[in-house]
From Swiss-Prot:
<dbReference type="GO" id="GO:0003723">
    <property type="term" value="F:RNA binding"/>
</dbReference>
<dbReference type="GO" id="GO:0005737">
    <property type="term" value="C:cytoplasm"/>
</dbReference>
<keyword id="KW-0255">Endonuclease</keyword>
<keyword id="KW-0819">tRNA processing</keyword>
<dbReference type="GO" id="GO:0001682">
    <property type="term" value="P:tRNA 5'-leader removal"/>
</dbReference>
<dbReference type="GO" id="GO:0004526">
    <property type="term" value="F:ribonuclease P activity"/>
</dbReference>
<comment type="function">
    <text>Part of ribonuclease P, a protein complex that generates mature tRNA molecules by cleaving their 5'-ends.</text>
</comment>
<keyword id="KW-0963">Cytoplasm</keyword>
<dbReference type="GO" id="GO:0030677">
    <property type="term" value="C:ribonuclease P complex"/>
</dbReference>
<keyword id="KW-0378">Hydrolase</keyword>
<protein>
    <recommendedName>
        <fullName>Ribonuclease P protein component 1</fullName>
        <ecNumber>3.1.26.5</ecNumber>
    </recommendedName>
</protein>
<dbReference type="InterPro" id="IPR002730">
    <property type="entry name" value="Rpp29/RNP1"/>
</dbReference>
<dbReference type="InterPro" id="IPR023538">
    <property type="entry name" value="RNP1"/>
</dbReference>
<dbReference type="Pfam" id="PF01868">
    <property type="entry name" value="RNase_P-MRP_p29"/>
</dbReference>
<dbReference type="InterPro" id="IPR036980">
    <property type="entry name" value="RNase_P/MRP_Rpp29_sf"/>
</dbReference>
<comment type="subunit">
    <text>Consists of a catalytic RNA component and at least 4-5 protein subunits.</text>
</comment>
<dbReference type="InterPro" id="IPR023534">
    <property type="entry name" value="Rof/RNase_P-like"/>
</dbReference>
């Protein structure tokens, strides 16, 4: 993740972070800054990250700024406060937004 800049265009937050590679850019606990690895568990208020050394660390979402490697290869910088809440609710909202866009674009074609 070193040396890559996040894209500045409007991005959707990935609906689930589990399995994605992340890096903690800022945190109120200085020992967690720079932590890099893969999200193994996403809970309502925390992330459990499997580090490159093989340890599992818990990071509180509301106190962190993280960078996520999205499936398309882009890097997205996210404030943890945006991620607070049940991840499954975020999936439902994401599906609703995508399906709504598809419906509105199909109306424009006719």
């Amino acid at each position: 993740m070193k040396g890559r800049r996040p894209s500045h265009r409007r991005q959707l937050i990935p609906p689930l972070l589990t399995g994605l590679r992340v890096k903690v850019l800022a945190h109120s606990d200085p020992s967690l800054e720079g932590l890099e690895g893969w999200v193994v568990v996403e809970e309502a208020r925390s992330l459990r990250i499997l580090t490159l050394e093989g340890r599992v660390s818990t990071v509180l979402k509301d106190l962190a700024v993280i960078e996520v490697e999205a499936p398309g290869g882009e890097y997205i910088r996210i404030s943890g406060r945006v991620l607070i809440g049940n991840p499954l609710d975020r999936v439902k909202e994401y599906r609703w937004r995508v399906s709504r866009r598809c419906r509105s674009s199909s109306r424009l074609k006719t």
